[in-house]
Amino acid sequence: MHYMGLFSRAGNIFRQPRALQASNAMLQGNLSLTPSKIFVGGLSPSTDVELLKEAFGSFGKIVDAVVVLDRESGLSRGFGFVTYDSIEVANNAMQAMQNKELDGRIIGVHPADSGGGGGGGGFARRGGYGGGRGGYARGGFGRGGFGGGGYGFVR
């Protein structure tokens, strides 16, 4: 029995670094997942994906564009994302479009992976309505609140 406790403690010692390594790898993966993806906030309720592509398409090739919709009402949540084929193009678009008018509204443009404040319940509490919901009006987009919250996408 004495040896069981020893092996148990030894097992915990060996498990800890692996857990830390996995955590670090996951963090690194999140931070570099899509560096050419930008967050566009302050969108008008009438702004759709086509208008978003039209406004941001002049900077370079758009790989993907999304306007996030409320799951229940189907209305725009006032933000979206544009993904370019390169980081340089994304940076140029962010600089050029920051605080510009689009569809009657002044928009804010930031790197999507910056974690710029706002909601998110983290890994344990995904889903928008229970925890902080994030969103542009609250200072940014929270990854956790977006992940499993069931918000619709328009592509």
UniProtKB/Swiss-Prot annotation:
Induction: Down-regulated by salt stress. Residues 1-27 form a transit peptide. Pfam families: RRM_1. Signal peptide: none annotated. Residues 36-114 form the RRM domain. SUPFAM superfamilies: RNA-binding domain, RBD. It comes from the Eukaryota. GO terms for cellular component: endosome; Golgi apparatus; mitochondrion; nucleus; ribonucleoprotein complex; ribosome; trans-Golgi network. Keywords: Mitochondrion, Ribonucleoprotein, Ribosomal protein, RNA-binding, Transit peptide. GO terms for biological process: response to salt stress. The keyword Transmembrane helix does not apply. InterPro entries: Nucleotide-bd_a/b_plait_sf, RBD_domain_sf, RRM_dom, SLIRP/GR-RBP-like. It is found in: Mitochondrion. GO terms for molecular function: mRNA binding. The keyword Transcription does not apply. Possibly has a role in RNA transcription or processing during stress. Component of the mitochondrial ribosome small subunit. PANTHER family: HETEROGENEOUS NUCLEAR RIBONUCLEOPROTEIN 87F-RELATED. Belongs to the GR-RBP family. This is Small ribosomal subunit protein mS86. It comes from Arabidopsis thaliana.
